[in-house]
Amino acid sequence: MTAPMSIEPETGSSPGLTELISKWGRLSDSFLERRLTNISSARQEITAIKTENEARAKALRQSLEEDRAFWTNKITALGYKVAKRRMAMVTTEPGESTAPHLEVVHSDKGLLGLFEISAGDQLLCPSAITPFIRDRGGPGTCPLCLRTFDQKLEGHIYTELISSGHGVSRGSDGAWRAHFTGDTPPVLFPRKTLGKERAATLSAAIKQFKCLQVDHCTLEGIIESLAIKAHKILDLCE
């Protein structure tokens, strides 16, 4: 009988396969390690961005609340002054002189500026806003005196209106208007010293001053109405 043939393993292929498996293991470990590192780094970046955004949102909310309080106080204080002086006008007996009162004055171009109005219905400058107008404006020609200025034109026009004793009249709608025979001066309302958002807030609030134009309102009613409207305006502006 013929003896069975023995099958010898292919010893030459075993070292190559082992090396290939080992290399594949090293590459896999390296790949997974890099992926885990990248994931960890990305997670840290996301956490940092989230923390930063939360801090910004908190700062923004705080800023809005501070603005709300600031402008509510300013608007209410301004409304109180206007209302108090209007009440003085209403209670003045016939023939008595009216005390100067703070008013928003309009022109043909729209809102002109914030002035005090004398007993003779002439423009005065309220000391509260003098710092806002002293150095305001760029170059241009004054439509009142026709002089040319390199800067501070609006501040000059404000002063010119007051020094010339320019008069105003009150319309049937309760608004005070200044009328000019020549060119109408530009808008002088001190909004350029304010931020865009705050200027818009204040302008919107002034449009709500119709409650101050009703002479028979009580002082308490005027102030309460103004405060409510101011809060609504600030809510819309936010």
Curated annotation (Swiss-Prot):
Lineage of the organism: Viruses, Duplodnaviria, Heunggongvirae, Peploviricota, Herviviricetes
Name the UniProt record assigns to this protein: Uncharacterized protein ORF35
Organism this protein belongs to: Ictalurid herpesvirus 1 (strain Auburn)
Chain's gene name: ORF35
